[in-house]
Curated annotation (Swiss-Prot):
GO terms for MF: UDP-N-acetylglucosamine 1-carboxyvinyltransferase activity
EC nos: 2.5.1.7
The protein's name: UDP-N-acetylglucosamine 1-carboxyvinyltransferase 2
Keywords assigned by UniProt, alphabetized: Cell cycle, Cell division, Cell shape, Cell wall biogenesis/degradation, Cytoplasm, Peptidoglycan synthesis, Pyruvate, Transferase
Species the sequence originates in: Symbiobacterium thermophilum (strain DSM 24528 / JCM 14929 / IAM 14863 / T)
Record PTM 2-(S-cysteinyl)pyruvic acid O-phosphothioketal, positions in chain: C119
Gene responsible for this protein: murA2
Organismal lineage: Bacteria, Bacillati, Bacillota, Clostridia, Eubacteriales
Annotated NCBIfam families: murA, PRK09369.1
Length: 423
């Protein structure tokens, strides 16, 4: 049954929130665990959000054994991976389904995977991935909404990653890990999640060098074996709770983080007038009056596109006018129509939002249509006067584990209720 959040705004947040494992690391790493034809992998700090659940279902359907042996621990054994067609009804629900294609090409030399579904934030074309597969000797075409392999003769190659795409970089590392010869990726993404993936593959016996730089070198090996690995903390989840604290007001410690992964976000929050302190693996945010600050999303280490939406919600309460320019995805301002229902003053011109701050938001029924836009609506709801009902919670669940429980523990008045129920 679909659900909604009912949020009564106005409560200040206080306490400590623990950040889970990075979804954007877990998706490729859980997929890469199935590259191992020997042994089993134990993955720790794995978030239990719906995207990870869907991926585990896909791997089971392909013949892998996947068990959640503890709240944040997965055991994966892929010796019996033998099916090359990912079930359509599962793959279409997952943006990371393209990684499964790379896995199948590497392990089985053939594959058929539905083109990715997920959030309504514009096109995420598979063309970059298809070009990468072609550079490694695999001809993959799109037919009837699915990626289908035709001729596959995997071998190392040199490939330029358009727009420093994170997804394409991930997929090329996965595919090239078992491809004979050496693969060189130029203009590769540098995100911490790329480094995390490379560390795991190397622990399995792979040979990935240069992760975290623009040039990544992968020397293919004959076989990989299972390994133990702890996934890095989710910098996007951490940044979201930091912005929620600034918007709602309060004093919150965000724990289990790597502060250097959030350098740009911390700098922008400080520029916006917030008090931010780093203590080991914790970041403390004390809310202060919000100043308007311009932001342009960029690849890492720039301001993350996945935090653009919560930032817009925060800037909607700032003193002054701010400009937010989105350079990674088109159509990522769709959520602003819902913020406007809550009293925000935002004008969008293609990939730029101009935000004139207001003193407060007012509660209203709103609908989330993507993960981060949903987080932005909750951010606004926490700071709003009155009650806000946020439907489309299934999108939020794709990227955040038990958000309502974590916020309630900080003092927020937030409940998850079935859609259609009377309040």
């Amino acid at each position: 049954m679909t659900a909604k959040f009912v949020v009564r705004g106005g409560n200040r947040l206080s306490g400590t929130v623990t950040i889970g494992g990075a979804k954007n690391s877990a998706l490729p790493i859980v997929t890469a665990a199935a590259l191992a034809a020997e042994g089993e992998s134990i993955l720790e700090n794995v978030p239990d959000n719906s995207d990870i659940q869907h991926l585990c279902e896909i791997l089971r359907a392909l013949g892998c054994r996947v068990e959640r042996v503890a709240e944040t621990t997965l055991r994966i054994q892929a010796r019996e991976l033998e099916h090359h067609v990912a079930p359509y009804h599962l793959a279409r629900r997952l943006r990371g389904s393209t990684y499964v294609m790379g896995l199948l090409l590497a392990r089985l030399g053939k594959g058929e995977v539905a083109c990715p579904g997920g959030c309504e934030i514009g096109a995420r074309p598979v063309d970059f991935h298809l070009k990468g597969f072609r550079a490694l000797g695999a001809e993959v075409v799109v037919e009837h909404g699915a990626m289908v392999s035709r001729r596959v003769d995997l071998r190392g190659g040199r490939f330029y990653v358009d727009r420093a795409s994170v997804g394409t970089t991930v997929n090329m590392i996965i595919t090239a890990s078992l491809a004979p010869g050496v693969t060189v990726l130029e203009n590769a993404a540098c995100e911490p999640e790329i480094v995390d993936l490379a560390n795991f593959i190397n622990a399995m016996g792979g040979r990935v060098r240069g992760a975290g730089t623009n040039t990544v070198r992968i020397e293919g090996v004959d076989r990989l074996r299972g390994a133990r690995h702890e996934i890095i903390p989710d910098r996007i989840e951490a940044g979201t709770y930091m912005m929620m604290t600034a918007a709602a007001g309060g004093d919150v410690v965000v724990e289990n983080v790597i502060p250097e992964h959030l350098g740009t976000v911390i700098a922008k929050l400080v520029e916006a007038g917030q008090e931010v302190e780093e203590h080991g693996d914790c970041i403390r945010v004390r809310a202060r009056p919000i100043r308007a600050v311009d932001v342009e999303t960029q690849v890492y280490p720039g301001f993350p596109t996945d935090l653009q939406s919560p930032w817009v919600a925060l800037m909607g309460l700032a003193d002054g006018i701010s400009v937010v320019h989105e350079t990674i995805f088109e159509n990522r301002f769709g959520f602003t129509n819902e913020l406007i229902r809550m009293g925000a003053k935002i004008k969008v011109d293609r990939n730029t939002g101009i935000i004139r701050g207001v003193k407060r938001y007012t509660g209203a029924p709103v609908e989330a249509r993507d993960i981060r836009g949903g987080a932005a609506l909750v951010t606004a709801a926490l700071a709003a006067e009155g009650v806000t009902e946020v439907s489309g919670v299934q999108y939020i669940d794709r990227g955040y584990t038990r958000m309502e429980e974590k916020l309630a523990a900080l003092g927020a008045d937030i409940r998850r209720v079935p859609n259609g129920s009377e309040q």
